[in-house]
């Protein structure tokens, strides 16, 4: 069961507030190394942004030349298989946009739940598209039901990306 769309503009508006922030330090390609005790060799694993499955349509950065490479700090998460650790951290850091906001009282028919995908319509802006619900707070009073949310995405909308609305090198 898909969540209803969140809409900022027009007659179908159901978003009260919506604030999008761009994470300029992510996404990054990640590299991690560890010592293999069996043969005393160095094992290195990497995860590239271009290999990740996107939440939305188009990656916010054009290619590998726009993405930096970072080495993970040794020791963090050592109990986890190295490739899994690198992939997990790359996925976490790939969230280029974080949005916070709230739905209009009585206007949104759905119940937002974490880890669900929702489509957000913000006109023709590049930040329209698919988001993942990261966090939601439900407030129920005698007269109102309110939802405040945090959404994340690692992509921009295809229509905005192809329209020239995104200045080159900005996203």
Question: Which role fits each region the language model picked out?
Answer:
Residues 14-171:
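An acidic/polar, Gly/Ser/Thr-rich interaction patch typically located in mid-to-C-terminal regions
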Residues 1-12, 19-21:
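Charged- and aromatic-enriched interaction segments used to assemble
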């Amino acid at each position: 069961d898909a969540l209803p769309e969140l809409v900022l503009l027009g007659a179908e508006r159901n978003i009260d507030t919506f604030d999008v922030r761009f994470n300029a330090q992510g996404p990054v390609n990640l590299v991690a190394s560890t010592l293999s005790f069996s043969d005393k060799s160095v094992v290195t694993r990497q995860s590239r942004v271009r290999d990740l499955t996107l939440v939305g349509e188009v990656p916010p950065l054009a290619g590998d030349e726009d993405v930096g490479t970072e080495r993970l700090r040794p020791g963090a998460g050592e109990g986890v298989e190295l490739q899994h650790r690198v992939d997990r951290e790359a996925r976490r850091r790939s969230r280029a946009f974080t949005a916070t906001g709230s739905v209009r009282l009585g206007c949104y028919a759905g119940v937002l739940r974490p880890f669900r995908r929702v489509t957000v319509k913000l006109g023709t802006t590049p930040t329209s598209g698919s988001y993942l619900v990261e966090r939601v707070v439900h407030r129920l009073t005698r007269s109102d039901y309110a939802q405040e949310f945090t959404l994340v995405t690692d992509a921009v909308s295809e229509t905005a990306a192809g329209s020239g609305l995104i200045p080159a090198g900005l996203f």
